[in-house]
Structure formats: structure tokens, C-alpha cells
Amino acid sequence: MKEQLKGLLDQAQINLSEAQIEQQLALVGLLDKWNKAYNLTSVRNPKDMLTRHIMDSLAVRQYLHGQRFIDVGTGPGLPGLPLAIAEPDNEFVLLDSLGKRIRFIRQVCHELKLTNVTAVQARVEDYQDEKQFDGVISRAFASLNDMLSWCEHLPAENGRFYALKGLYPQDELEQLPEQYKIESIEQINVPGIDASRHIVIISKRS
């Protein structure tokens, strides 16, 4: 599986150290193990997890600006955990309302010795942090409208929202609240995934 991951990373032109590659593989191993008991993801095959979870998460790395991020509705830590492994100098808060997902994330952090991740069990609209975030990341979480409504208190003044989507979300974009602007919409090519992927980057109007 290591050679498969290295090949995928080369195709995507993503550079990770040998230690980071081992951590990504260990994450897949833990996800596979926990998934059998706790049903954390519908993806059952570890090789599919490499493409649909690890590579799909890492594909957004190049678009992130800043050092402090929150991954809302993170599920089993996606995309937050793969990103935190790849960016050890950045800080990631991973938020989800389900306890089993948060327990899994904490176990991963313990076993992989990730010190830049904080796992929080809460509903996003109820969550308050002492410091605001450079980026609010969501993957398969909610419509753009709902994400902005529930998360409007989280980004810093110049912070951004990063919404990971499948198909180009035309209908959602047309309903965007006036106080927000689209900074860019990028089509993401993920090696091993044929399906359409997009990232929508949004900021508040000044």
C-alpha cells in the first residue's frame, strides 16, 4: 500500500516526508480497524481509503492560507487529520457532534503523536473558541448557505471558508448571502477518483 500511496502523491505533485507517508498509512490502518466496530465510513477497502479519504483530503492543501484551521463536521477526521499530518506547523481543530468520531480522532492523535490537532465534540453553531480561525473547512457537511449561517462566528477578519464539493454547486452559489463573496472556485483533480471535485473559497465582504 505504501507504493500505491507514493504513486498517488507523485501524480498529485504532493511532497510528504517518509515519516508523514508512514503516518498517513497508519491513519488508514486505524480507520480500517475502528470502522469494523464503529462504522465511521462507508468506504470499506483500505486501498480505496487512500484515494477517497487521504488523497481527496490532501488535494485541498495547496489552497489553504493561514496557520489555524477548523474542520467542521469532520466525521472521522477528514480532511483534518491528513492535512494535520502534512502540515505539522499548522493548528487544526476537528469538530463533530458524534462521540465515537471524536474518540477515534483522539486515539489517532495519541498513536501518531499528533500535537497540532484538537478534537472537539460539539455542534458547530454552539462552539466558541478564544481565537478565531484563518480557515473554516467543510467536506460533505452542509449546503453553502447552512455552512455560512452556522459557522459565521468562526473565521477571523480576513479568514476564509473552504467548502469541498462534488459537482459544481450552481444552485447553492446562486443563493449565497449578500455579505459573502466568492474568492474562487477550483476544480480539483484527485488521482484515482474519476468523480467531479470542487473547492469553493468564500470570504466576508469588507
Curated annotation (Swiss-Prot):
Record-listed S-adenosyl-L-methionine binding positions: G73, L78, V124, E125, R139
Xref: InterPro entries: rRNA_ssu_MeTfrase_G (IPR003682), SAM-dependent_MTases_sf (IPR029063)
Subcellular location: Cytoplasm
Keywords assigned by UniProt, alphabetized: Cytoplasm, Methyltransferase, rRNA processing, S-adenosyl-L-methionine, Transferase
Keyword rRNA processing: yes
Gene Ontology cellular-component terms listed: cytosol
GO-annotated molecular function: rRNA (guanine-N7-)-methyltransferase activity
Primary location group: cytoplasm
Matching Pfam families: GidB (PF02527)
Keyword Disulfide bond: no
Reaction equation(s) it catalyzes: guanosine(527) in 16S rRNA + S-adenosyl-L-methionine = N(7)-methylguanosine(527) in 16S rRNA + S-adenosyl-L-homocysteine
Record EC number: 2.1.1.170
UniProt function note: Specifically methylates the N7 position of guanine in position 527 of 16S rRNA.
Similarity section: Belongs to the methyltransferase superfamily. RNA methyltransferase RsmG family.
Name of protein: Ribosomal RNA small subunit methyltransferase G
Source organism per UniProt: Idiomarina loihiensis (strain ATCC BAA-735 / DSM 15497 / L2-TR)
